[in-house]
Amino acid sequence: MTDKSYQPTLAGLRAFVAVAEKQHFGSAANALGVSQSTLSQALAALEAGLNLHLVERSTRRVFLTTEGRSLLPHAQAAVEAVEAFTTAAAGEADPLNGSIRFGIIPTVAPYVLPTVLAGLTRRLPTLTVRVIEDQTERLLTALREGSLDTALIALPADYRGLTEMPIYEEDFVLALPPGHPMADRHGVPVAALSELPLLLLDEGHCLRDQALDVCQNAGVRAELADTRAASLATAVQCVNGGLGVTLIPQSAVSVEAARSRVGLAHFAAPTPGRRIGLVYRASSGRDEAYRQLAAIMGESIGNEQQVRLVN
């Protein structure tokens, strides 16, 4: 009778499966990369632990006993499960060879995400990216709670326990109603915003805070328009309709200008702008993987957008 407390070893199960499939001890040993004596000892230990004969040995061939034939599918399933576990663990050890939960803010996603995903697909074909678009604060909370792996946001995040990895910087461009006299001008002083109705995004969008910071840093008290938008695309369409002006990042210019008739003006130096980069948990132990991820993103974005890569 088999002792139910007995726990077969993986070596014993592999030996049994190999012998059953090869029907030859020498061939089975070669398949496992062990000596024939090691194989025989592992199989003998399994049979002793089970108190069963699993194979009939002869000088030329190996035959399975009735018990061996009955237990073989279970042994094969156990070996396959361990191999699947090992493969999955190897994927977890390399976060860029599996699945990654990637957050991105709404004022970045529509303009760089297609380029980023194409670059990742080309350079990391085994990586599956799950994209979560949300406002900065909610992405940072998700990171700290472990429901996100990394996020592409405007820096600095200034969040305890998170590591920041800058990727690129870009200028802000002033979007104006069609036919505005400032359209196509360069060297526009930030102080000019004091004379223009400034459209802002809703609370929670980092671009709203950045626009207000631009005014504050320049000592300008902006005239805020009554209209607010939930997205940059809506803000630009409001500008297109003559409801005010707004700041848009350089990466958004080609997309937003193409679907509207807004005028564009460029600020005088030092040009206001923003820095975009990856953030992730400092405790993740994935610094090298995320450095590689950031490098691929930077290369992809730099090839398509008028931004300044941060080394």
UniProtKB/Swiss-Prot annotation:
The domain of life for this entry's organism is Bacteria
Q: Which GO terms describe its cellular component?
A: protein-DNA complex
What InterPro entries does its record include? LysR_subst-bd, Tscrpt_reg_HTH_LysR, WH-like_DNA-bd_sf, WH_DNA-bd_sf
The UniProt annotation gives the DNA-binding region as 25-44
Q: Recorded GO terms, molecular function?
A: DNA binding; DNA-binding transcription factor activity
Q: Name one Pfam family in it.
A: LysR_substrate
- List UniProt keywords, sorted A-Z: Activator, DNA-binding, Transcription, Transcription regulation
* Domain (HTH lysR-type): residue spans on this chain: 8-65
Question: What does the UniProt record say this protein does?
Answer: Required for the induction the katG gene for catalase. Involved in the response to hydrogen peroxide.
The family this protein is said to belong to: Belongs to the LysR transcriptional regulatory family.
Q: Which protein is depicted?
A: Probable hydrogen peroxide-inducible genes activator
